[in-house]
Amino acid sequence: MDKLADLNYTLSVITLMNDTLHSIIQDPGMAYFPYIASVLTVLFTLHKASIPTMKIALKTSKCSYKVIKYCIVTIINTLLKLAGYKEQVTTKDEIEQQMDRIVKEMRRQLEMIDKLTTREIEQVELLKRIHDNLITRPVDVIDMSKEFNQKNIKTLDEWESGKNPYEPSEVTASM
């Protein structure tokens, strides 16, 4: 473990890789050298990052299979991203988590639709009651007995001398 974290060891490995590449490739103008160097750098970085991480994870984890599977999937996804692919490899656990999240969201939306539908039905019933109260109904005879200002008014038969006292009479003004 000390060797993996030692800076001198890392620098010696990089120097060894550079010396090996320069000995293999004698022509300094070779076109593929940057690509080969970047691939080797990525592989070396993955090697340096994944091995200690996997060792620690396997020691501390209860389920080593899931840890190894997760590390391998992460490495494959990293390589796919470096290669320019937009697709990713997923495990069944991730798919199940996404399905659970989708089902939970659908249930939440269905509950909201149910609440909204109930509110809309209540609003429609309220509007119907308001409409029914506002509709004018044709009435043949108007019942004036309920009018409070009609109590003391006498009918034509009850008036003295049969004359309406409220009817205006002719008034002559003097000049």
UniProtKB/Swiss-Prot annotation:
What is the membrane topology noted in the UniProt record heading this document? Single-pass type III membrane protein
Which biological processes are named by the entry's GO terms? monoatomic ion transmembrane transport; symbiont-mediated activation of host autophagy; viral process
**UniProt cross-references to Pfam families, sorted A to Z:** Rota_NSP4
Keyword Magnesium (UniProt): no
Q: Which residues are glycosylated?
A: 8, 18
Gene Ontology cellular-component terms for this entry are: extracellular region; host caveola; host cell rough endoplasmic reticulum membrane; membrane
Record-annotated residues binding Ca(2+)?
120, 123
Locate the transmembrane regions by residue number.
Answer: 29-51
One Gene Ontology molecular-function label: toxin activity
Protein localization: Host rough endoplasmic reticulum membrane; Host membrane, Host caveola; Secreted
Say which domain of life the source belongs to: Viruses
Which ranges does the record list as Cytoplasmic topological domains? 52-175
Question: Modified after translation how?
Answer: The N-glycosyl content is primarily Man(9)GlcNAc, with a small amount of Man(8)GlcNAc.
Q: Which UniProt keywords apply?
A: Activation of host autophagy by virus, Calcium, Enterotoxin, Glycoprotein, Host endoplasmic reticulum, Host membrane, Host-virus interaction, Ion channel, Ion transport, Membrane, Metal-binding, Secreted, Signal-anchor, Toxin, Transmembrane, Transmembrane helix, Transport, Viral ion channel, Virulence
Query: InterPro entries under this entry?
Result: Rotavirus_NSP4 (IPR002107)
Residue ranges that the UniProt entry lists as topological domain Lumenal = 1-28
State what this protein does. Answer: Plays an essential role in the virus replication cycle by acting as a viroporin. Creates a pore in the host endoplasmic reticulum and as a consequence releases Ca(2+) in the cytoplasm of infected cell. In turn, high levels of cytoplasmic calcium trigger membrane trafficking and transport of viral ER-associated proteins to viroplasms, sites of viral genome replication and immature particle assembly. The secreted form acts as an enterotoxin that causes phospholipase C-dependent elevation of the intracellular calcium concentration in host intestinal mucosa cells. Increased concentration of intracellular calcium disrupts the cytoskeleton and the tight junctions, raising the paracellular permeability. Potentiates chloride ion secretion through a calcium ion-dependent signaling pathway, inducing age-dependent diarrhea.
Its family remark reads: Belongs to the rotavirus NSP4 family.
Known partners and oligomeric status? Homotetramer. Interacts with the immature particle in the viroplasm. Interacts with host CAV1, early and late in infection. Interacts with host integrin ITGA1/ITGB1 heterodimer. Interacts with host integrin ITGA2/ITGB1 heterodimer. Interaction with microtubules blocks trafficking to the Golgi apparatus.
The UniProt comment on domains reads: Binds 1 calcium ion per tetramer.
In Swiss-Prot or TrEMBL terms, this protein is called Non-structural glycoprotein 4
Organism this protein belongs to = Rotavirus A (strain RVA/Human/United States/D/1974/G1P1A[8])
- Organism ancestry: Viruses, Riboviria, Orthornavirae, Duplornaviricota, Resentoviricetes
